C-alpha cells in the first residue's frame, strides 16, 4: 500500500509540472493578446485622432473655399461694373472722335502687352501724323493682360481710346515646347478686331504693333488703299510693309505692288473680310495662317516698295530673330507722297497682270553662276529664272533677300515673281517655273 502511495506521488509530480507549464503558456498567451489588444486600441485612438485632424482641416479648407467663392463673386460684380464703366467711356470717346458726322476711313489700333517704353515710342510716332487727321482715323490702344505700366501709359493719352483684353483661360499648346505667347497674341487679335468691327461698327481697321514707327504719308497711303480695296474685291488687305524693304533693295517711294504673300506689320482689312475670318480664326500663328492659300483664296495684298512702317522691336515674341539682318536695315519712307493725286488703277486685278508682265518682259535675262556680279554689271533690269524652292533659296541667299516660303509662295512674290532693287534704280526679278505662263509672257 505504501508502495502504491509512493508511486502516485511520483506520478503527481510530472502532472504538477505539466499543469504549471500549461498555466505559464496560458499566461504568456494572454499577455501577448493583451499587448496586441493594447496596440490595437492605441492604433485606433491614433487613427481617430488623425481622422479628427483631417476633418478639422477639411472643415477649415471648406471655409476658405466658401470665402474664396464669396470673394470671386464680389470680384465678378466689380468686373461687371468696371466693364460697364469702360463701355461708357468708350462710347463717349467714340462719340467725340466721330463727332461732326464724318465717317472715319479706318480705326487705328496699336496692339500692346507689356512694353511700356516701346508703346510710348510708337504712340509718339503715330500721333505726330494722326493728330491732323484724327477724325478720319480714331486711335485705339488694345492691351493684352494687366501690365500696370502699359495701362498707365495708355490712359495718360487723351487723344485715344483704351481697351483691355483680360483672358484667364489657360493656354494649351498643340505641340510640346511651343511658346504660349503666340497663342495669347492670336486670342488678343481676335478679341480686338471683334471689338472694333462689331462693337464699334468700324468698316475698316488698321493694325499696328507696339514696336512700330510710321512714315509721314502713312495715313494718306491707307486712304488711297481703302478706295482701291472698295473697287477691287480681289484685294484682301493692304499693308505698309515690304519684307525686302531694306535700304539696299528699294528706291521708289511711289511704287506699289500686288503680292500673293501676306506682309503684315501695319495692315488694313475691311469688315467684310473679318466676317469671313473671325469664325475660323486660328489658335496661334495667325499671320502664317493668313498666308495659307485655303484662307486668302486667290486674293492678293497691296504692299509698297518703300515701307511706311519701321519695326524697332528687337526684343519680342520672336526673340529678336533675324532683327539685325532683316528688320534693322529697313528703309522707312521719308518722302511725303500726295496719294490723292496718284492714279492707282494699274493695281486693280484687270490691269496689274498686264502692267507687271510688261516690267518682267523688258528685263534682261541672266543665268549661270556669279549672278550678283552679272546683275551689278548690267545697266538694265534683269530677270533670273529659278526651277524650284531650293534654287530660289540659293539665289535669294546670294543677293541677301528673304529666302522663306509659306505654302508654296516666296515672301513678297506675285505669281511666283519676287522683285527688288539693286544699286538703287535697277530691278531684279526672280522668276518662278510657272511665272511666265501665269503672266502671259511669250517668247521670253
From Swiss-Prot:
Reaction equations catalysed: N(4)-(alpha-D-Man-(1->3)-[alpha-D-Man-(1->3)-[alpha-D-Man-(1->6)]-alpha-D-Man-(1->6)]-beta-D-Man-(1->4)-beta-D-GlcNAc-(1->4)-beta-D-GlcNAc)-L-asparaginyl-[protein] (N-glucan mannose isomer 5A1,2) + UDP-N-acetyl-alpha-D-glucosamine = N(4)-{beta-D-GlcNAc-(1->2)-alpha-D-Man-(1->3)-[alpha-D-Man-(1->3)-[alpha-D-Man-(1->6)]-alpha-D-Man-(1->6)]-beta-D-Man-(1->4)-beta-D-GlcNAc-(1->4)-beta-D-GlcNAc}-L-asparaginyl-[protein] + UDP + H(+)
Cytoplasmic-facing ranges: 1-6
TM region positions: 7-24
Active site: residue positions: 287 (proton acceptor)
A Pfam entry, by short name: GNT-I
Topological category with respect to the lipid bilayer: Single-pass type II membrane protein
Cofactor(s) named in the record: Mn(2+)
GO CC terms in record: endosome; Golgi apparatus; Golgi medial cisterna; Golgi membrane; trans-Golgi network
Binding site for Mn(2+): 211
Gene deletion effect: Plants have an increased salt-sensitivity resulting in growth inhibition, aberrant root-tip morphology and callose accumulation.
Tissue expression: Expressed in roots, stems, leaves and flowers.
Keyword check for Transmembrane: yes
Main localization of the protein described in the UniProt heading: Golgi
Lumenal side: 25-444
One term of GO molecular function: metal ion binding
Gene3D superfamilies linked: N-Acetylglucosaminyltransferase I, Domain 2, Spore Coat Polysaccharide Biosynthesis Protein SpsA, Chain A
Gene Ontology biological process terms, A to Z: hyperosmotic response; N-glycan processing; protein glycosylation
Post-translational modification: Glycosylated.
Pathway: Protein modification; protein glycosylation
E.C. number(s) listed in UniProt: 2.4.1.101
Glycosylation sites: 351
Coiled coil start-end: 61-92
Any further remark recorded for this protein: Creation of a second N-glycosylation site in mutant cgl1 C5/cgl1-1 interferes with protein folding and sequesters the protein for degradation in the endoplasmic reticulum.
Family: Belongs to the glycosyltransferase 13 family.
Function: Initiates complex N-linked carbohydrate formation. Essential for the conversion of high-mannose to hybrid and complex N-glycans. Required for normal root growth and morphology.
Name of the molecule in the record: Alpha-1,3-mannosyl-glycoprotein 2-beta-N-acetylglucosaminyltransferase
Amino acid at each position: 500500500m505504501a508502495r502504491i502511495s509512493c508511486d502516485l506521488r511520483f506520478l503527481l509530480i510530472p502532472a504538477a509540472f505539466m499543469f504549471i507549464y500549461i498555466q505559464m503558456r496560458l499566461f504568456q498567451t494572454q499577455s501577448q493578446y493583451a499587448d496586441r489588444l493594447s496596440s490595437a486600441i492605441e492604433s485606433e485612438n491614433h487613427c481617430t485622432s488623425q481622422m479628427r485632424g483631417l476633418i478639422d482641416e477639411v472643415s477649415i479648407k471648406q471655409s476658405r473655399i466658401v470665402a474664396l467663392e464669396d470673394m470671386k463673386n464680389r470680384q465678378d460684380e466689380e468686373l461687371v461694373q468696371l466693364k460697364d464703366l469702360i463701355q461708357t467711356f468708350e462710347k463717349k470717346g467714340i462719340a467725340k472722335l466721330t463727332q461732326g458726322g464724318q465717317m472715319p476711313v479706318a480705326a487705328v489700333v496699336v496692339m500692346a502687352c507689356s512694353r511700356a517704353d516701346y508703346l510710348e515710342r510708337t504712340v509718339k510716332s503715330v500721333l505726330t501724323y494722326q493728330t491732323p487727321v484724327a477724325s478720319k482715323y480714331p486711335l485705339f490702344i488694345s492691351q493684352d493682360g494687366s501690365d500696370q505700366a502699359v495701362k498707365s501709359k495708355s490712359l495718360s493719352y487723351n487723344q485715344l481710346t483704351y481697351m483691355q483684353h483680360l483672358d484667364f483661360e489657360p493656354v494649351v499648346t498643340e505641340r510640346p515646347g511651343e511658346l504660349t505667347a503666340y497663342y495669347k497674341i492670336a486670342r488678343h487679335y481676335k478679341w480686338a478686331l471683334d471689338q472694333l468691327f462689331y462693337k464699334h461698327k468700324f468698316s475698316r481697321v488698321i493694325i499696328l504693333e507696339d514696336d512700330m514707327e510710321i512714315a509721314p504719308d502713312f495715313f494718306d497711303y491707307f486712304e488711297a488703299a481703302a478706295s482701291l480695296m472698295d473697287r477691287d474685291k480681289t484685294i484682301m488687305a493692304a499693308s505698309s510693309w515690304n519684307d525686302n524693304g531694306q535700304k539696299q533693295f528699294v528706291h521708289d517711294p511711289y511704287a506699289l505692288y500686288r503680292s500673293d504673300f501676306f506682309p503684315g506689320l501695319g495692315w488694313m482689312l475691311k469688315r467684310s473680310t473679318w466676317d469671313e475670318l473671325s469664325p475660323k480664326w486660328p489658335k496661334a500663328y495667325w499671320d502664317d495662317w493668313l498666308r495659307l492659300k485655303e484662307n486668302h483664296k486667290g486674293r492678293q495684298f497691296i504692299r509698297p516698295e518703300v515701307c511706311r512702317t519701321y519695326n524697332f522691336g528687337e526684343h519680342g515674341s520672336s526673340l529678336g530673330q533675324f532683327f539685325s539682318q532683316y528688320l534693322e536695315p529697313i528703309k522707312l519712307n521719308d518722302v511725303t507722297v500726295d496719294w490723292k493725286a496718284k492714279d492707282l488703277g494699274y493695281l486693280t486685278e484687270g490691269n496689274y497682270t498686264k502692267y507687271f508682265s510688261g516690267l518682267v518682259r523688258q528685263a534682261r535675262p541672266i543665268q549661270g553662276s556669279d549672278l550678283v556680279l552679272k546683275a551689278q554689271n548690267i545697266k538694265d533690269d534683269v530677270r533670273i529664272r529659278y526651277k524650284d524652292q531650293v534654287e530660289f533659296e540659293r539665289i535669294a541667299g546670294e543677293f541677301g533677300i528673304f529666302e522663306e516660303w509659306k505654302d508654296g509662295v516666296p515672301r513678297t512674290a506675285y505669281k511666283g515673281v519676287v522683285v527688288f532693287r539693286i544699286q538703287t534704280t535697277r530691278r531684279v526679278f526672280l522668276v518662278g517655273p510657272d511665272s511666265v505662263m501665269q503672266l502671259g509672257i511669250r517668247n521670253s
